[in-house]
Amino acid sequence: MAETPIVYSTEGAAGKPVVVVHGGAGRRRHPFTPEREQQAAADIKRALDAAMAVLDAGGSALDAVVAGVHVMEDAPEFNAGRGAALTSEGRAEMDSCVMTGDGRCGAVAGADCVRNPIDAARAVMEKTPHVLMVEPTEAQCEAWGVETAPQPYFILPERERQLAELQALPDGGWDKPGHGTIGVVARDAAGNIAAGTSTGGVTNQQPGRVGDSPIAGAGTYANQQTLAVSCTGTGERFIQESAGYQLHARVLWAGQTPSDAAKAVLEAVEERGGDGGLICIPVEGEAVVAHNACAQMDWGYAFGDVRVTHN
């Protein structure tokens, strides 16, 4: 029988601007060295500081989320942006989504030329009539004012080594999903909430595979009636469970607390053979971090002068 998911919550953040960051959850095939663990924790703190700087200046939850995601996408320790996992063809195909509590949403999938995929996701939300766009081109990014980067920028030696190891296995399997995917959720001084998620997918995935991260209601969701959430883990299972929306629905209609709802969602994911975690911030109340007991998760939160990181 599966163990009960592990849940943490902030203490003292209720009613205050707050940010929560995750650096992915799952079963690591390639454990971090102590040095990389330290660097990952430092990067999470930098992301928290960047997001809180926005909130402390009176900025919006959306701007805070994008600022935090930027830091994580630029950090090679995480499977997003610069550190993206590689497909079976040795290319980076990245997915990202951003959503605000009023229902606005933008996402990209299969992005292969966007330096910071979260910027392209925001551009889809703010500069097009669409919600999800696949393989945004350099011309589109230029029109949106979004910075591009060539494939070599994303292809790191460590990721090439991981791909080669997997392809040398008898079954040519793919990596354990989830680890390194990044997400940020925030609540600003006005009580507005937002969520953003960014990922490079899964090492050795087939070209064109899309996980839960860019799917509103699966890996990313925000609703001003309840909460903002970013998920990480076995993407296919989070999609099947409509994890982000399910969390919202359990709080809104079943009357569950965010903590209890998070446990129930992750139990449902595990029943399908998946694992992972999530971070969420309610419109009111304490922020929540949760992950399956079998999964490892990197995360942190910040409010006021408080900074907490865990990995």
Listing of model-derived features with the role each one plays in the protein:
Residues 2-311:
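Alpha/propeptide regions of enzymes that mature by internal proteolysis
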